[in-house]
Design a protein with these regions (language model features):
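Residue-identity detector for glycine
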Residues: 37, 67-68
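Bacterial N-terminal signal peptides that target proteins for export
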Residues: 45-56
Length: 445
């Protein structure tokens, strides 16, 4: 859009053409509500969304009033989505990911982008590449770039993500990480062309630790798996315990020796094994499990030697989303998703949804569909995105990690949302989750 055509979105109803202005209702007042028995006004988040649409409409009307501001064809903004096939290995069959896990979130977010983008003559579309185990991630990224995708949302492991990020520099491609939790991607291996929507393990561990400390469950027994990712989550939990004043009274490792857990004798074997693994531990308030590999943690609740709650990779689990979350207007998104895809919305779906919405917000509020200007706005202090979390989400400028509340889920209900009350920060309470600016090793390059 030429600079002379950019219209301020900070408009009021008085800026509308007379035809539209006549239909504007006057503001609610407490006296009207009380005396006339009128319904309560919409929630603040709903009103904010309506104001946002109104501003976009004002801009559109102003452009049309200038005469011929719209072209016949909208500006096409291609959003790439590069994903690897998810592992189907889960302890519980109900947790096996759907084939469109993540992709469904991308498509739903594109609908939301277009709901506002049409007022600015913008059209968003997702182009996708699914990687098999031996497929070349860099070649897939280049194929998406060849289709016009300057922003590519990724659901890749850390090693593949770094390969794509380094190769993407020559294509002026910006990646938005929606899956990898690895701290190193935001620290010593950070990249200036990678934005992170997926939380870090430290953010998840800190969110859990804050709640356990708030509950005064400060004596933890830590049981960790034998795989590399399990060790990384265990490190994050140990750091969180030290940071917030909990004490790990004992650490044990659960060796993954394989085995056929779904044989006819599997349930009986697990019932005998889990108490033995946890027997003889010092006095503790909670058993904290680090088992990203889905080997043992799901079997711990109700099977431990001592009657203790389980948290971490099972029991009370920190996550960015769950199908039961219904606060701050989230039920509307949950219902839309379930109606469209006939399944619950997962945390991965939500992370991809948020990534695609960030691109749409940058295009709508940044005043341009040009990728460089969109990226500059996304990295600016003015940028934020609403994601049904009760507050606007922003980027940490030192490592491009999205600040966000973390939900604590017990399998059926959202037990709490961190950061917890009383954990303060001089900039944002959200910065109590994960490594803070003084701790970072990131030098964006």
């Amino acid at each position: 859009m030429p600079a002379s055509r950019i219209i301020s979105l900070q408009a009021s109803p008085d800026d509308l053409p007379p035809m539209l202005r006549r239909n504007q209702r006057r503001p609610w007042s407490e006296q009207q509500t009380a005396e006339q028995g009128l319904p309560e006004p919409a929630a603040p988040e709903t009103l904010s969304w309506k104001r946002h649409l109104l501003r976009l409409l004002v801009a559109a009307c102003a452009l049309m009033a200038e005469g011929g501001a719209w072209s016949d064809q909208p500006q096409e903004i291609k959003i790439g989505y590069l994903r690897q096939a998810p592992s189907k290995i889960r302890i519980s069959l109900i947790d096996v990911p759907a084939g469109n896990d993540g992709l469904a979130g991308a498509h739903l977010a594109t609908e939301d982008d277009n709901a506002t983008g049409r007022f600015l003559n913008q059209h968003y579309a997702v182009v996708e590449k699914l990687l098999g185990e031996g497929d070349d991630a860099v070649a897939a990224m280049n194929a998406l770039a060849d289709q016009g995708a300057s922003f590519i949302v990724t659901s890749l492991d850390a090693d593949r993500l770094l390969q794509v990020a380094d190769a993407g520099r020559t294509r002026s491609v910006t990646l938005i990480n929606a899956l990898a939790l690895d701290e190193r991607l935001r620290e010593q291996d950070c990249r200036a062309n990678v934005i992170h929507v997926a939380p870090t393990r430290a953010m998840l561990a800190d969110a859990l630790a804050q709640y356990l400390v708030w509950k005064k469950w400060t004596k933890w027994m830590l049981l960790t798996g034998s795989h590399d990712n399990d060790a990384l989550f265990a490190d994050a939990l140990r750091h969180a315990a030290t940071r917030f004043g909990a004490k790990i009274v004992e650490q044990r490792e659960f060796k993954d020796n394989g085995g056929a857990r779904r044989t006819d004798s599997g349930v009986a074997e697990i019932q005998r094994q889990m108490p033995v693994v946890t027997q003889g531990a010092p006095e503790h308030d909670v058993l904290v499990a680090a088992d990203e590999s889905e080997v043992f943690a799901g079997y711990l609740p109700y099977r431990t030697w001592d009657a203790r709650p389980v948290a971490g990779s099972a029991g009370l689990v920190p996550t960015t989303w769950n199908a039961a979350f219904d606060q701050w207007g989230a039920v509307q998104l949950q219902n839309r998703f379930t109606k469209a895809y006939q399944r619950p919305m997962t945390a991965h779906d939500m992370q991809v949804w948020t990534a695609v919405r960030m691109i749409g917000e940058a295009g709508a509020r940044g005043g341009s569909a040009e990728p460089g200007k969109m990226l500059a706005y996304m990295k600016s202090p003015e940028f934020s995105v609403a994601a049904f979390k009760g507050q606007k989400l922003t980027l940490r400028d030192w490592n491009l990690q999205l600040r966000q509340p973390i939900l604590l889920f017990d399998g059926r209900n959202t037990v709490s949302v961190s950061p917890q009350e009383g954990f303060l920060h001089q900039v944002s309470a959200l910065d109590t989750l994960g490594l803070d600016r003084p701790e970072t090793k990131c030098r964006l390059k």
